[in-house]
């Protein structure tokens, strides 16, 4: 697993590189699979899973398994269909429809066609991520956040005096 710190608010992206593509033994792949399952099912701080798929091709059996597993455990997820720039724009809708059908994406499920080359989907994806990581108005901050807010308030009061 690779951890990428995104900002000072302790937001991290965790990457499971090539869970379906690594050239390793079936035994090693099974060990990785259990590690990924354990990580995803036991992370209280998990906000959103981005399932990265290649829009040029049908989803792999691993893509389908992961999608089904995430749905089964009701984990917040977004399918990010990358490499849209590698497909003629006139064929995007066909590829999107095929990908959604083969994965079993339902209306209301998060699905974003994406291209880092042309910026397609970038703003939509960051907006979605932002919506998952920021507490809603109805949500109270957890105890760690509450403590941090209290400390900041005390510091502001002491600097004003």
Positions of the model-derived regions?
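Canonical P-loop GTPase G-domain recognition
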Residues: 86-143
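Long, low-complexity, intrinsically disordered segments
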Residues: 144-161
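Switch I (effector-binding) loop of TRAFAC-class P-loop GTPase G-domains
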Residues: 1-8
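Conserved protein kinase catalytic core
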Residues: 21-24, 60, 88-89, 121
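Conserved C-terminal guanine-recognition region of P-loop GTPase G domains, centered on the G4
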Residues: 34-109
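Switch II (G3) loop of P-loop NTPases
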Residues: 9-34, 54-57
């Amino acid at each position: 697993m690779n951890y990428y710190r995104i900002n000072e608010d302790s937001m991290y992206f965790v990457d499971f590189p090539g869970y379906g593509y690594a050239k390793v033994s079936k035994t090693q792949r099974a060990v990785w699979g259990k590690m990924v399952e354990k990580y995803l099912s036991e992370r209280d701080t998990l906000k959103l899973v981005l399932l990265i798929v290649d829009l040029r091709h049908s989803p792999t059996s691993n893509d389908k398994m992961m999608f089904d597993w995430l749905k089964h455990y009701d984990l917040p997820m977004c399918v990010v269909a990358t490499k849209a720039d590698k497909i003629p724009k006139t064929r995007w809708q066909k590829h999107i429809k095929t990908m959604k059908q083969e994965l079993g994406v339902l209306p209301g499920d998060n699905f974003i066609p994406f291209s880092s080359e042309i910026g397609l989907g970038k703003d939509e994806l960051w907006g979605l991520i932002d919506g998952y990581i920021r507490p809603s108005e109805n949500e109270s901050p957890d105890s760690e956040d509450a403590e941090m807010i209290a400390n900041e308030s005390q510091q502001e009061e002491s600097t004003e005096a």
